[in-house]
């Protein structure tokens, strides 16, 4: 499918030393640079998603204070936690096709602008119903994750996409941990000057302002692809700011929205990855929601200490999830897609076993230590999942990313509903059962098979017809001479 009118000049970036492929995507990952559009997109994407995580998880660390003020029952608090995840299920499913149509930059900014007033409205809640509704709508902001991963896949080539996705999402997820750490401190500071019943309400002004600020930065300094911004949804026009040249693809040459949607929904690999993400990232979300209360109730630590312990779980994302992406890329380079799948299974299985152990440790410091190690593996597993996602479908990448991302929140909703709902929940038992579910569902990775690359237990298909069909939907990496190399990754059996 060739465009009717194409700019024939090679991509021109302010950082002329950055190596790119034929589509202008960076073949190296430089997280500490701002000179190229790739690096700027990376920093804007993770910072925007960071603010959304901060907003969504700004409520749980203040739940003991809010519950006391509004007389919330344990079942109401649990229902609100489920509601926050349920909201993001629908928004993530919608975000994928939206990114395909209008681009990740605009999609991300629109979502942040729409959800910032919701977190601000948390200061106005006065009943259990309004508390649950606020958490439901605040959860919509987590769909920014889909735009984040879509944006990285548009900017970075296949040989570094696992690392780019892992670092971008990992650094963003730290927002949940920082929120657990800072919100009690913000509340305590404000409570020095205002009544407690007012102080917790004023605290929510800060995440709302932060979210709006990042949305403005995304619009001002970001661009959808290495070549420029998508101008509208009817024509795939990309404007190159430096040269004011336009790349045009006529509408009748583009895949229609329906084709994009069907291509993603009909790809079974997307649904398996959604299940795996539900019991890696979904488990992480559930832990973020319950871990502060777990240490507060079981070990009798104070609110600030519980928040600090919970924060350490989320903050480990700064290294753990990127490590998962690095492992995926390293195994992909050495063993091909099969290496990525084996790595995912091993890391997620270990995470499940550690979660089982976390619920069975009876000492405070022992629980903290196991929680730290568990956080490393469960977050790395999330990075490994999105080390596979970009290879499922090029045409329907947004839909596949949306399905997988929604799987994370569906997993969190199901897990919290089954294991952490009600007024008489034994959280230590529920945590161990959550780990067992993680271990069992990790086995589903064995069903993922790519005709040209194989799966965990068998090599690539010898059917050229099946390979040709699949290759048309997959990301293809190219070497410096433009030769496709991703379809011939080395089998291991």
Swiss-Prot record:
Pfam families: MFS_1 (PF07690). SUPFAM superfamilies: MFS general substrate transporter. Expressed in seeds, leaves and shoots. Lower expression in roots. Induction: Not induced by nitrate or by growth on low nitrate concentration. Down-regulated by imbibition. Its main location: membrane. The lineage of its organism: Eukaryota, Viridiplantae, Streptophyta, Embryophyta, Tracheophyta. Keywords: Membrane, Nitrate assimilation, Transmembrane, Transmembrane helix, Vacuole. Gene3D superfamilies: MFS general substrate transporter like domains. This is High affinity nitrate transporter 2.7. One of its GO terms (molecular function) is nitrate transmembrane transporter activity. Residues 1-19 have a biased composition (Polar residues). Involved in high-affinity nitrate transport. Controls nitrate content in seeds. InterPro entries: MFS (IPR011701), MFS_dom (IPR020846), MFS_trans_sf (IPR036259), NO3_transporter (IPR044772). Belongs to the major facilitator superfamily. Nitrate/nitrite porter (TC 2.A.1.8) family. The keyword Protein transport does not apply. It is a multi-pass membrane protein. It comes from the Eukaryota. The chain crosses the membrane at residues 46-66, 70-90, 113-133, 136-156, 174-194, 202-222, 257-277, 299-319, 341-361, 368-388, 400-420, 431-451. Disruption phenotype: No visible phenotype during vegetative growth. No effect on root nitrate influx. Decreased nitrate content in mature seeds and delayed germination. It is found in: Vacuole membrane. One of its GO terms (biological process) is nitrate assimilation. It comes from Arabidopsis thaliana (Mouse-ear cress). Residues 1-20 are annotated as: Disordered. GO terms for cellular component: plant-type vacuole membrane.
